[in-house]
Amino acid sequence: MATIKDIARLSGYSIGTVSRVINSHPDVSEAAKRKIEEVIRKTGFQPNSNAKLLKQASTSAITILVKGTKNIFLETILEEIQELLRIHGEAVSVVFLDELADEVETAVQLCAERKPKGFIFLGANPDYLKKSFGVITVPAVLVSGDADGLGFENLSSFCTDDFAAAKEAVGYLLSKGHTKIGIVGGMGEREHGNVGADRLYGAMEKLKESGISFERERCYEPAKFSAEAGYDSARRLLERAPEITAVFALSDTVAIGAMRAAKDLGLSIPDDLSVIGFDGIEYSRYSVPRLTTVEQSSSLLAQRSVEDLLLRLNYPRPAVHEKIPFRIVEGESVKKPKK
């Protein structure tokens, strides 16, 4: 039986693009859509156990809500989760939402309209969970976000310790001699459990512990987790604070945009500016220069979330909350600053 990787290989498009076509994502060119759908027809590929492309949430399916339409890391997890659920014979539906949308309110509406058997949230805002999740009674999992402490017995969570990982990323830059560090990404939230907030405040905490002054208004620029937003925000940051010698991007997609912005401003990476990202997406291994990043395991996040959800669907048990390991992967985008 053909797999999503076979479709990517035969069509010449990335797995992420294939996944977007399968899930009726709007951000795909017509040429890519036609080619991928042609390969799907020729191979007889079956995206789920019902052997059909689900274009909207269906009754009794496990529904996956993806927060952000251009977050490559979440799309990678999505692909792995879909494959695992397919193996277990589960029907799956996917809903893509804007990064600022209320994903929990969407889930509540789906409960009323289509009665899904369970939810997987790929990213979520803790404020939205606190406000509305209490009316959801089916088992659910939050991936890449921390629901520990929210008190919902039917909501598990699996994530990296974003606060600790961000501290380690900034510590890595400090170990190379950087003290003039800028931060790009997230929306500047203060709520614990929000990925962007935990990474931002982890980075700021490490600078504080190291005795490094950090002027947030000058050295931090918010951005959605996309390359385009990373480019725009990094450009604003570097034009405002040209003394910066290193940038910590709160996601790899933001980092890739930031590197392009630096290039367009006449800066060489890593000679003039060092950049470290977060996530460890596949593209980070092929950027020029190769991106140094905090790597978290998309496969482990997918595996644990699916295992937990399926177990709780069949055997009622309390929610669990786990942190998965992370590590710094050294690429070519960081070096000591010029004297």
Regions found by a protein language model. Give the residues of each.
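Short beta-strand segments enriched in small/hydrophobic residues
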Residues: 17-19, 54-70, 172, 180-189
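Short acidic capping loops at alpha-helix termini that bridge into adjacent secondary structure
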Residues: 180, 214-218, 269-274
